[in-house]
Structure formats: C-alpha cells, structure tokens
Amino acid sequence: MAQRKKIALIGAGQIGGTLALLAGQKELGDVVLVDIMEGVAKGKALDLQETRGVGKWDVDVTGGGTTDYSVIRDADVCIVTAGVPRKPGMSREDLLKVNLDAITKVAHGIKQYAPNAFVIVITNPLDSMVYAMYKVTGFPKNRVVGMAGVLDTARFQYFVGDAAGVSPQDVQAMVLGGHGDDMVPLLRYSSVAGVPLTRLLDKAKLDAIVERTRKGGGEIVALLGTGSAFYAPAASAIAMAESYLRDKKRVLPCSALLEGQYGVKGLFVGVPVVIGAGGVERVLELELNDDERAMLQRSVDSVKKSVAETKL
C-alpha cells in the first residue's frame, strides 16, 4: 500500500489549526502540528483526532514542540505560520523585525529534517518572509513559495460577487504584486463567467472594491481586535498544497521568485504560477498596460524595501 503524504504545519495558532482541519478533511496526508507552545500543538492535534470518526476522514494528526524539529522529518509539504499576527495599528512592515527571527529558526529546522519539502510561507510580512525562507534553506526556487495572491484574489472575488449579486465561484480574478497596500488587482483580466466586470459594475464600485481588497486584511484585524484573518488564509494555502500533492497544475497567484519576468529579478512577488508535482513549475507573464506596469512597479518597490530590511 502506498505511504501517505506528510504535511508539517509550523505554527499551531488560528491559521495552523484551521490548516490541520482542512488538510484532514481533504485527506491530503498525515498532519503534524508544531508550535513553540507544545501543549497547544498537542491539544489541537488530539482535538482533531477526535474529529475523525464524526468527520469521516482517516489521516493522523500529531503535535510537537519547536524544541525538536525531528517530528517534521521527511515532510512532503511544510506550511509556515510561525510568528506573531498583526495587531490593530500594526503594518505588515512593523512585523518584520519580530517575525524574521522566527522564520530563520523554522528555516533551519526544515532544512535539516525536511530537505525535499515544498514550503509554503504565510507569515507576514509575506514577501520578505518567503525571501528569508528561500535564502536560509537554500532550497531551489520551485520549492519555496508565499501564500498571498490566492488570498487577495479570493477577497476580490467575494467583494465582486457580493456587489454584482453572483457567486464568488463564478468570478475570475487576478491580483499581482506584493501582499500589502500596493497590491495590484487587474480589472482587465477579471470577469464574471467571461462577462467583463465593467459590464456589471460601474467605475466607482470597482474602484471601491479594489481599495477594499487592498485593505482587506486590515479590515479583519480591526474587527477581530485580537488577531488577524485565519479561515481564508488557511483555505488559500491548502489550495496550493493540494495542487502540489495531487499534481493538479492549477494556475494560482502566489509570491514566487522572479528572474526577469515582469522586469523583476531576485525578488518574491505575487504573480500567476502553475503549481504541480514539480512545485512552482512556471511563471505566467501577463501583458500589462502602462498604468498596470506603474502600479506593479510601486508594489515591487515596497517589496524591495521590505526585503532590504532583512539584511539577507
């Protein structure tokens, strides 16, 4: 019998716990939750194990602490949420100094015990944290990716669907750039079941949707008061992991290393990529007009500034 895949979730907070539940329900593979608070990881793992009977799914969920990364040994996928979440008043950039140390330690653990893993980074500020993961692990560019664009696009899909009175599932959308206030929702490449957005919504509504998408994470932070979004980020990362583990070759907007595409070199920026068994198998380059290129360049400049602060 074929051996089940193994998914390591590093960080057992709100996103980590939701990731574990979704991975279990989809039976993507056995799950190991790892956290600096070992009891939290083990407690959530046990809670999830006790869900299997009623949920009708059969993969194991175990927990462990960050004092012993050997529990992630030979993981096929590592999804990293370690670090602190945004708090009200904090920008993603404020998080950099706090979370860089955590990511560096995690990267060393992954490099030692899961050297062949496909690594998905969720920790913010995303584009600099995924860059740090790439530099510290030394993994090839196709095996390190950041979860940003899938989430940003999902938010855009919901806002469009809500405004147009249609299912978000029928909204085709694309968001480029960094995971921050300078992200670039591409209206020209977005539609509802093939119908251009401009046929369904006026410019004022579309402009408001673009702005709300850019501020989407902050909106939830303000409402929660004690943390940041976790359901949609977890679902977005699971879509990426599933495409890799099941070789689905989905086209997903992710933070990937660019080597000349879109005029960018040596940075992780949100672009459409194909994710399959080879990891990030290719970057799809869209034709941009002058306005879109200018917006993307502003986003890239923000990413460049954030990455420079890592000093890696």
From Swiss-Prot:
List of residues binding NAD(+): 11-16, 35, 99, 122-124
Positions contributing to substrate binding: 86, 92, 124, 155
Reaction equation(s) it catalyzes: (S)-malate + NAD(+) = oxaloacetate + NADH + H(+)
Name by which UniProt lists this protein: Malate dehydrogenase 1
Lineage: Bacteria, Pseudomonadati, Myxococcota, Myxococcia, Myxococcales
Gene Ontology annotations of biological process type: lactate metabolic process; tricarboxylic acid cycle
Keywords tagged on the record: NAD, Oxidoreductase, Tricarboxylic acid cycle
Family that this chain belongs to: Belongs to the LDH/MDH superfamily. MDH type 3 family.
Top-rank taxon, per record: Bacteria
This enzyme's EC code(s): 1.1.1.37
Keyword Membrane assigned: no
HAMAP family attached to this UniProt entry: Malate_dehydrog_3
Catalytic center residues: 179 (proton acceptor)
InterPro entries assigned: L-lactate/malate_DH (IPR001557), Lactate/malate_DH_C (IPR022383), Lactate/malate_DH_N (IPR001236), Lactate_DH/Glyco_Ohase_4_C (IPR015955), Malate_DH_type3 (IPR011275), NAD(P)-bd_dom_sf (IPR036291)
Keyword Oxidoreductase tagged: yes
UniProt function note: Catalyzes the reversible oxidation of malate to oxaloacetate.
GO molecular function terms listed in the Swiss-Prot or TrEMBL record: L-lactate dehydrogenase activity; L-malate dehydrogenase (NAD+) activity
